[in-house]
Amino acid sequence: MTVQLSDEAYAVVEGRHADPFRYLGAHPEDGGTMVRVLLPDAVAVEVIGDNGDVAPLDQAHPAGLFVGPLPGASPRYTLRARFGDTTVELQDPYRFPPILSDFDLYLLGEGTDQRLYDKLGAHPMELEGVAGVGFVVLAPNARRVSVVGDFNFWNPLRHQMRVRGSGYWELFVPGARAGDHYKFDLAGPNGEQLPQKADPLAFAAELRPKTASIVVDATTLPRPRPAPENINALSAPMSIYEVHLGSWRRKEGDQWLTYRELAEQLPAYVRDMGFTHVEFLPVSEHPFDGSWGYQPTGLYAPTSRFGSPEDFCALVDACHAAGIGVILDWVPGHFPDDPHGLGNFDGTALYEHANPMQGRHLDWGTLIYNYGRTEVVNFLTANALFWLERYGIDGLRVDAVASMLYLDYSRPAGGWIPNKFGGRENIEAIDFIRRFNTEVYGKFPHSTTAAEESTAWPQVSRPIEFGGLGFGYKWNMGWMHDTLNYISKDPIHRKYHHGQILFGLHYAFSENFILPLSHDEVVHGKRSILGRMPGDEWQRFANLRAYYAFMFGHPGKKLLFMGSEFGQEREWSHDRSLDWHLLEYPKYSGIQALLRDLNKLYRSLPALHQLDCDPFGFEWLITEDANRNLFAWMRKGNDTRARCLVIVNFSPNVYQDYRVRVPFPGRWREVFNSDSAGYGGTNVGNGGEVRTLEGLVPELSLTIPPLAAIFLTPED
C-alpha cells in the first residue's frame, strides 16, 4: 500500500510537530478509521481491534511510521509490534484523552494552582483501565517536546507530547511506571535541538553526575507523624541545630550516612543535646557537592545522595517522633546554569530573566528567577507548600533574601536595571515573598518561615497587612557579626569595643530574631567558632563557654551549626565528617556538656524564651562597666516571678562582692555557671545560691568568675 505523506506526517517523523495527536492515533478517513503509529525501530506493526480482529499496518516511512485501517467500530485498540526477534503488545499513547482538564489549564494560566505538583511532572495513573505515567511540563516557546526514558529507549520520536493552553505539554505513556528514568527532549523556537532537560517537578533524580529524573508515585509516600503543634510559636523555646547531612557523620570508608541511618542516629543526638529543631542545609537535588545544596536543579526532589523520597520521609518521621521540629533551608533566589537544569529551558529565558543585568548573579555565577512571571511564582510557592504537605516539614529558612530584594545587589554602578519607579527595590520579588508567606501560613498556620536577610530592610518579620514581608523570623546577622568581632578581641582591648555588645539591643526587638552561628561562619578562612577565641588554651575554651552562655541569655531564638556544640577546631568541610574523636578529651566534652545544659535551661526557664521577641522580656541592669568587660541584664517571662539574672564577664579577672540590684529580696539560686569544673572551668562562683543584702533596695553581692557567665533565678 502506497501512502502519500502530508506535510503534517513529515513534521511528526522529523520531530517538529506541536500536536502529534492531530496526526497520530485513530482518525476518521474515507468512511472508516485510519490508525497512524510512530514506532522507531519496529520491523512490523499490527493493530488489534477491540473486537479481537487483527490488521497489519503498512510502513509509510522508514523512521517507523505505520499506517492502516482499524478493524471494528470501537476506537479502542492495542498494537502488536516486532522489534528484531522480539514481539510485544503495547498501547498507543495517542489514543488516550488529555491529562489536564480545562479547569487545570485555567489555574495554571492564572498561576494560582497551589498544588501544582499534582499536575506537572510525572504521575503514575490509570486511564481507561490502562496503567502508565502522565507527563506534563511547561515549555511555551518550544517547537516540540518529547519525553524520553527507560520506557522508549530514550528515543525522542517515540513519545512526542502535545501542547495545551499556556504552553503546557502533556502525554500519557502507557506502561511507564514508578522507578523509570526520564528526561524531556526539546526543540527550541527555531527548531534547534536543546540539551535534554530534567523534570523541574521531578520527585526524585539520579545520583550525580547522572542527571535523569525518576518517576515516583508520591501518593504512596508515607506521611511523617506531626511535630508538637506549637513548636514554632514565638513564646516557645527554639534552639536550632543546623546540619549538613553529608558531613555530620560518616561511616566506614568515609561514606555518607543514608537518610535511614541518619534517622537512627541524628534525632536521638539532637534530643539528648536539648535542641528543639534541626535545620537541614538544602536537601533539594543539586549537581555539585561543593555548593552544599545552595545551587539546586531539582527543587521537588530530596537529593538521592542519601536515599529515596521514602527514606527522607523516615528521617523526618524519626525527628518528629523525638519531638524535634524540622526546618529546611530553601533556595528560591537563584539556580545554576547546568545544561539539564532550568536555564534556557525551552530555548528562551523561561525561568530566568533574559537580560543578564537582571538574570545572572555575578557573585555565584547562577541565574536569577524572573518573579514577574506568574508561572515562575506558582512554581516556587507550590514548591514551598509541597515540602510542608508531602514531607511534613515544619518550617522553611529562605536563603539569600537580600539578593532577591535589591536589583543592584552585588552589582557595579550601571550594571543593573532600576524598577519602574527608578528605584533599586525588586518589586516583583517583594510580591513573591509576600505571596509565599501568605500561602504558607494560610495553609499551614503552625509552620514557620525565616529569612536570611543581611541588610536593614524593615519589617522582614512583620505582618504583610502592616507593610511587612510576612516572615515568622529573621536571622540577626548584625548580632552575629558584632559579637563574633567582639569576642575575637583580646580581653584587654574589649573595653574599646563595648558598644558592639550593647548595640544589638537597640534593635533586638525590631524583628523576631534568630541568633545564628551558622555554617557560613566556619568556612572560607573564617576559622571555627572556637578558632576565633583569643588567648591561651584555657582562655580559648573559657571565652567560648562565656560566649555561648551570653548567646543563650540574650533575647532571640538560637541557631548553632553542627560541630560548634563541642568545639570543633577545624573549619567545616562538606567532604569529611565532624571531628567526633575530640569528645575523648575533657575540654571538648565540657563544651558539649555546657551546650546540653544551656539548652535544658533555655527550654525549662520561661524567662529565657517566652518573651524572646518582646521588649518586655528584657531589662538592662549594667551597661557601663566597660573597664571590667562586664554586662548584666534581667530576662523576664509572663509570670511576675519568672526572672533570670544574666551576668557575663568577658575579662579573665575574678570580681568579688560585685553588687547587682534585683527586683525581689530573698534567695537567688545560681542555676548556671559556665566556669563550672564540669565544663572545664575553675569552679569560681557563689556556692549555688546567694541572698540579697539587707537594705531598702534588694541587692546581691556576687562573686563573678573569669571569662564566664552566671544565671540566677529567684527562689519561689
From Swiss-Prot:
Keyword terms, alphabetized: Carbohydrate metabolism, Glycogen biosynthesis, Glycogen metabolism, Glycosyltransferase, Transferase
Catalytic activity: Transfers a segment of a (1->4)-alpha-D-glucan chain to a primary hydroxy group in a similar glucan chain
Enzyme class: transferase
Active site feature: 399, 452
GO molecular function list: 1,4-alpha-glucan branching enzyme activity; cation binding; hydrolase activity, hydrolyzing O-glycosyl compounds
UniProt pathway: Glycan biosynthesis; glycogen biosynthesis
Alphabetical list of InterPro entries matching this protein: A-amylase/branching_C (IPR006048), Branching_enzy (IPR037439), GlgB (IPR006407), GlgB_N (IPR054169), GlgB_N_E_set_prok (IPR044143), Glyco_hydro_13_cat_dom (IPR006047), Glyco_hydro_13_N (IPR004193), Glyco_hydro_b (IPR013780)
GO cellular component: cytosol
Quaternary organization: Monomer.
Annotated function: Catalyzes the formation of the alpha-1,6-glucosidic linkages in glycogen by scission of a 1,4-alpha-linked oligosaccharide from growing alpha-1,4-glucan chains and the subsequent attachment of the oligosaccharide to the alpha-1,6 position.
PANTHER family, A to Z: 1,4-ALPHA-GLUCAN-BRANCHING ENZYME
Family designation: Belongs to the glycosyl hydrolase 13 family. GlgB subfamily.
Name by which UniProt lists this protein: 1,4-alpha-glucan branching enzyme GlgB
